[in-house]
From Swiss-Prot:
A molecular-function term among this protein's GO annotations: pyridoxal phosphate binding
UniProt keyword list: Cytoplasm, Isomerase, Porphyrin biosynthesis, Pyridoxal phosphate
Subunit structure: Homodimer.
Organism: Thermus thermophilus (strain ATCC BAA-163 / DSM 7039 / HB27)
Keyword Disulfide bond: no
Localization, UniProt: Cytoplasm
Name of the molecule in the record: Glutamate-1-semialdehyde 2,1-aminomutase
Gene for this chain: hemL
Main location: cytoplasm
Length: 427
């Protein structure tokens, strides 16, 4: 499979660039960090995708995280088809959103109320507005390399696509607005404590990725988590951004895995089962500030639309009914992590492999990689070789060194062995 040709994808890419900025609807898809032509995908099944040229790839992107069950899971498709026959969207309450809200509450016991939106950006943006409305305080704390979507107040020293493109924030974000976001180092508990001591009474909320996936995978230290919870002494709300980790690292996400107690949680990706859906959720006294109950306004034409609710409900039902899935993903992830380390060590390549459950990143630098600054030491030129060596052998890894790769329950041990063999050849 080495040296796959993609002339049809190349033609599509050139045409797309005439009609769509950069030829893509989200920047990282353009392969700017790695060069070359992105495969234009036309089909997915299980752990595999096919491009317009007919090439098959073992997929570790998994639509950037939502597809924990794999592509085109038959039970998810059946639920969506059944719902589709009844209508696409109504702009009205539906039984499906009630059922999905109840499922979220079972996964996150601290949650009393859930509000559905369409994207992770909407969820985090709305959660921050709510936090400010509830506390009557102006400032937000976020951490370098944590990505919370592209709302103006959060696109400040962000990770994900912003990091890949080499811009720590974005043009078009007013400096005055950005100043309301205090940016601290991730995994620096003393830095957080110092800011809380100095400015705690001005801070509405701290938003954080419990396990970072958008600067590559970064794992929180125990003392950092302890410092986060100490923020409550100052009346500061904790917002766990679980758009990526929710329902992926455990049924109750990183909140369950790490024993966290946030005030609000944002969810997305797996929540929608492959369709656009997200949510913010939390304690009753906070969530009751949201319109129509309270003065904090948020709305959306397609929020809670039946198709996304159906896909999400089918996905969460399967995850809840099959708790062994998470054990399987942990074991498979451990095998992948171990194998990656073995191959890279054999090749004499400096590396650090960070993994939590079914999320993994290979950094090409001496470890450990604990902070955003550590992650930025990675050899991005070597990553390009790693990426294209795998892609040419039918392995579709995320096209950025600052993104997590994802496993699904459709991946097998054979798939992992195939990946490791391809890596050995590629390097």
């Amino acid at each position: 499979m080495e040296g796959m040709e993609r002339p049809i994808s190349e033609a599509y890419f050139q045409e797309a660039k005439r009609h769509i900025p950069g030829g893509v609807s989200s920047p990282v898809r353009a392969f700017k960090a790695v060069g070359g032509t992105p495969p234009f995908l036309v089909r997915g099944e299980g752990a595999y995708v096919w491009d317009a040229d007919g090439n098959r790839y073992l997929d570790y992107v998994m639509s950037w995280g939502p597809l924990i069950l794999g592509h085109a899971h038959p039970k998810v498709l059946a639920r969506v088809r059944e719902t589709l026959e009844r209508g696409l969207t109504f702009g009205a309450p539906s039984p499906l959103e009630v059922a999905l809200a109840k499922k979220v509450k079972r996964a996150y016991p601290f949650v009393d109320l859930v509000r559905f939106v369409n994207s992770g950006t909407e969820a985090t943006m709305s959660a921050l507005r709510l936090a400010r409305g509830y506390t009557n305080r102006p400032y937000i704390v976020k951490f370098r390399g944590n990505y919370h979507g592209h709302a103006d107040g959060l696109l400040v020293e962000a990770g994900s696509g912003a990091l890949t493109l080499g811009v720590p924030s974005s043009a078009g974000v007013p400096e005055e607005y950005a100043k309301l976001t205090l940016v601290l180092e991730y995994n620096d508990p003393e830095g957080l404590r110092e800011v809380l001591r100095r400015r705690g009474e001005e801070i509405a909320a701290i938003i954080f990725e419990p396990v970072v996936g958008n600067a590559g995978v970064l794992v929180p230290t125990e003392d950092f988590l302890k410092a986060l919870h100490e923020a409550r002494e100052f009346g500061v709300l904790l917002i766990a951004d679980e758009v990526m980790t929710g329902f992926r690292l455990a049924f109750g996400g990183a909140t369950e895995l790490l024993g966290l107690k946030p005030d609000l949680v944002t969810l997305g990706k797996v929540l929608g089962g492959g369709l656009p859906a997200a949510a913010y959720a939390g304690r009753r006294e906070i969530m009751e500030k949201v319109a129509p109950l309270g003065p904090v306004y948020q709305a959306g034409t397609l929020s809670g639309n039946p198709l996304a609710m159906a896909a999400g409900l089918a996905t969460l039902e399967l995850l809840e009914e099959n708790p062994g899935y998470y054990r399987y993903l942990e074991d498979l992830g451990a095998r992948l992590e171990r194998g990656l380390k073995e191959v890279l060590a054999q090749k004499g390549i400096p590396h650090a492999v960070n993994r939590v459950g079914s999320m993994v990143t290979v950094f090409f630098t001496e470890g450990p990689v604990v902070t955003f600054q550590d992650a930025k030491r990675t050899d991005t030129e070597l990553f390009k070789r790693f990426f294209h060596g795998l892609l040419d052998r039918g392995i579709y890894w995320p096209p950025s060194n600052f993104e997590a790769a994802f496993l699904s329950v459709a991946h097998t041990e054979e798939d992992v062995e195939k990946t490791l063999e391809a890596l050995g050849e590629a390097l």
